[in-house]
From Swiss-Prot:
Species classification: Eukaryota, Fungi, Dikarya, Ascomycota, Pezizomycotina
Gene: atg15
Protein name from the UniProt record: Putative lipase atg15
Residue spans, topological domain Cytoplasmic: 1-4
Catalysed reaction, written as an equation: a triacylglycerol + H2O = a diacylglycerol + a fatty acid + H(+)
GO cellular component: multivesicular body membrane; vacuolar lumen
Amino acid sequence: MSISGLLLSVALLPSVVSAHDHVYFDPPSSGSPFLGPQIPLTGPPALTGTHEFTLRHIYQRGTRDQPDLHRRLDIKPHTRLWAVSDDGLEKELVTFDTPLVASSSPLTIQRLADRRLSVIEGYLAAARSSGEAVALSPSEWVMDTLAGPNVTDKESVLTFAKMTANDYIEEPGTEDWHYIHGRFNYSSSFGWQSDGLRGHIYADKTNSTIVISLKGTSPALFDGAGTTTNDKINDNLFFSCCCGQGGSYLWRQVCDCQQSAFTANLTCIVEAMNDENRYYRAAIDLYSNVTDMYPDANVWMTGHSLGGAMSSLLGLTFGLPVVTFEAVPEALPAARLGLPSPPGHDPRLPQSRQYTGAYHFGHTADPVYMGTCNGVGSICTWGGYAMESACHTGQMCVYDTVEDKGWRVALSTHRIRAVISDVLEVYEDLPPCAPEEECYDCELWKFFKSNGSESTTTSTTTTTTAPTTTRTSTCKTPGWWGCLDESTTTTTITSTTTTTTTSTSTCKTPGWFGCKDPTTTTEATPAPSVTTTIPTPTTYPTSSTSTCKDPGWFGCRDPSSTTASITSSPSTTSTCDDPGFFWGCYDESTTATHPITPGPSAPYSTPSPTNKHTCTSSIFFGLICVGSTGTELR
């Protein structure tokens, strides 16, 4: 065809359009010599169908040790992969013999109309600066019905569970990493088992639907095995009330935001969660790179344990369908990150949201999934994990293995391979799914917001006014529990009213535990003084003299003679010839009274009759005498 003929044919076209526009020609008219190309109409994708997925890429996003690392491994037909066991010790060569098939069904999600990364980052930055989620108008939200995973089909649910169980590494010596950003000279010893967030990317045959499976928490409980150290930091940061503080001393502390008992700085916690070396920021970066490779694909999220929680947070952020298994309750970090919430929903309670498109499968014997792995004797606590969150967003699909199978609550039931073989494959029917609305996290805690510049040190000044008591006493007659003499006590209390209280008492009848006399109290204020005069009682001196020649267990067994000299008082003289076994005298007593002058001293006293008794018969080991003879001496 000549150039003139080509130009003529172009001129006869109805219109000229760009190459990427959809063009639909009208039926050719009878007078047109050319038949226009028939371009098929591209309508909306089908909401139902069957998808066969294959592993396409493996992503690694560095976090703690290498925060700037982001690399991708493309899976090719000749790529040799090893499957890593749950404990990270056993490896076996992978053969993809069984296809991963899942079906789709219509799913309604309420999400943002503009979900570009730059827009989402603006909302998150505003939430970090203000301390709360951005309030958006209803016009910025849409209700989209799209093709989502069919959570009522058992085979589809099993497929997603197997995706979360697969943990692959390339056979050593055959690595072929593509570095998205970061340095290109990482040593071969820096494998992805040492640091970072790992994601496995599956795509169907038409690349219209992709699944991002995020790697979950390493099962090792103590530091040094795989990514367990980094996983523990993120677990305690996202799912603890205050970064592992305020609980068991075994919990690993990952921030310093606690101010006092059950009181914490929420701004401090949120800043730590949004650091670039945390899993949530790494998950956003990983998701943005995957969507750059598949811009028109429908994205589904899945994950197990910590990976399931991160998948759910991404789903809430970008409005994606999510299927998780034994996921850590993630409503607490969703509220703290300030994720946008539709009108009519409290952003502080994301578990009350509807139409999230998230489904969390788990069973009642898993303490991590049920939010109970935080007791003093739990394995999580002994391993240093502070798993205090208890609420999930979206729908919970719970297998009651405790009631149905009699299982005990144990951390060993948390492993995804055990969940697949002992739960998902055993139960004939899938459990019903329902939201968990009546659930609250960290109810004992109080959180406050700040501008981020406050010091974490607090000081408290307490002023106390105490009374001062002055006591002066001289004891002449001490008793068992105090002095039996008269006492004078003066108490002065100093207060802001400068009131002085003085109490004076004189005891005439002392008792064992205090004075039995009535108490008289005189309060003195700035007024004319009052003088009170108390007469001094008369003291009678008493003298007693004794000499013991025959001491006993509890006293003297000698005949005793006591002479008391008191003016105008009687005197008594006694001599005991027959003392008792413990106390007392069996002799007859004689009393002499001298009404005018004291009686004569002992040498001039008149001798009294003396009786002597001899016991001839006794009972009760000699304590009682029943027969005696007596001789009277004069």
